[in-house]
A protein has these predicted regions:
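Bacterial N-terminal signal peptides that target proteins for export
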Residues: 1-11
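Sec/Tat signal peptide C-region and signal peptidase I cleavage site
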Residues: 18-24
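Short, glycine-/small- and polar/acidic-enriched structural segments
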Residues: 25-151, 156-159, 175-181, 197, ...
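Hinge/cleft segment of the Venus flytrap/periplasmic-binding protein
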Residues: 299, 303-325
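Short, solvent-exposed loop/beta-turn-alpha elements that line the ligand-binding surface or hinge
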Residues: 48-52, 199-203, 277-289
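Secondary-structure end/capping motifs
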Residues: 219-306
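Sec/Tat-exported extracytoplasmic proteins
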Residues: 51, 74, 79, 89, ...
Length: 325
């Protein structure tokens, strides 16, 4: 009898543990080094607490790699820009766009290196410009060249990931780059901003970042996607309620610096340069506006030879059902 009680207790504990693990889901989330308020929630473990999921956070340098990981099933939820998202959807990768993370403003820009001889857009002709291919930066670069009536064939566009851009910039191997932080911050140290994504948006070429999820994962774990979206939007609301007070909290800035690699002094400008849509905005945006933006992006990418065709309808790849007010 003395042995049975501990054994029964152990069996009960094992059953409880098994039940707990059965309820918890393993999910791999792909993130990038963009600066946004939700990175504080990421650093604080708020996503794990709200979703009750075992989350593995994986850092990626560009959206194209994230799409490849999602398509293979290695990643279930990912953060990427509108250009790689559009390219993926056009190729019918089974994903849903469930949250607009940011409408990109000053957080991405085209910078010309000091000493490159580039003072005006026309000076880009014959120069080397680095950008991660199929990224929002790539889309914006092509849109900027079109706006300035510069034939893309008259510049040398190099496909480099952000870490490689930083190295090439420091060596003086490239003349300009269209990129985001931390590479953007490095470029601005000895370079001139020619145009930002926010300015390009006014010329009819807006870009945005979004959170997407594999459709099969969303169907199996809708509660996780809903909780994930709520944590993100709560973080946005906390920032937008009083941006100055939020930035005055050094802990918030430190967490952004750690996860983004951006300089603390650049954080205010990067945050203020973007728009972080709240829940009410999401419900409206995750419909015709986003579908139209993706369609317009696909049309542009087809003109540039980056995708073979434009789908007749992108609505099945965009959903507001995971947004709770």
């Amino acid at each position: 009898m003395k042995l049975n009680f501990p054994l029964r207790l152990l069996a009960a504990a094992s059953l409880a543990a098994a039940s707990m693990f059965a309820q918890a889901a393993d999910v791999t989330v792909a993130y990038q080094t963009t600066v946004d308020p939700a990175k504080v929630a990421q650093a604080d473990g708020a996503y794990e607490k709200a979703t009750k999921a075992d989350i593995s956070w994986r850092k990626f340098d560009n959206g194209a790699d994230i799409i490849a990981a999602i398509a293979s099933g290695d990643v279930q939820i990912g953060y990427l820009g509108s250009s790689p998202l559009t390219a993926a959807i056009t190729r019918k990768v089974p994903v849903e766009t469930f949250l607009i993370a940011t409408q990109i403003g000053a957080a991405e820009a085209l910078v010309a290196r000091d000493g490159s001889g580039i003072k005006t857009p026309q000076d880009l002709i014959g120069k080397k410009i680095a950008v991660p291919f199929v990224s929002t930066g790539h889309y914006s670069l092509l849109a900027a060249l079109k706006h300035w009536n510069i034939d893309p064939s008259k510049v040398t566009v190099l496909n480099l990931a952000p870490p490689a851009i930083i190295a090439a910039w420091k060596r003086g191997d490239i003349d300009a780059t269209y990129v985001w932080d931390p590479a953007l911050g490095v470029a601005k140290e000895n370079g001139k901003v020619l145009i930002t994504s926010g300015e390009l948006a006014k010329f009819g070429a807006p870009t945005f970042d979004a959170w997407i999820v594999r459709k099969d994962f969303a169907e199996k774990h809708p509660e996780i996607v809903t909780a994930f979206a709520k944590v993100t939007l709560d973080a946005y609301a906390d920032y937008r309620k009083d941006p100055k007070a939020w930035l005055a909290n050094q802990s918030n800035v430190d967490k952004l610096v750690k996860l983004s690699g951006a300089k603390a002094s650049d954080i205010p400008l990067l945050l203020q340069g973007n728009v972080y849509p709240l829940a009410a905005d999401q419900v409206t945006t995750l419909g015709a506006p986003t579908t139209k933006a993706i369609t317009d992006t696909a049309t542009f990418l087809k003109e540039q030879g980056k995708v073979e065709a434009v789908l007749p309808d992108y609505a099945p790849y965009v959903s507001a059902k995971f947004i709770t007010n």
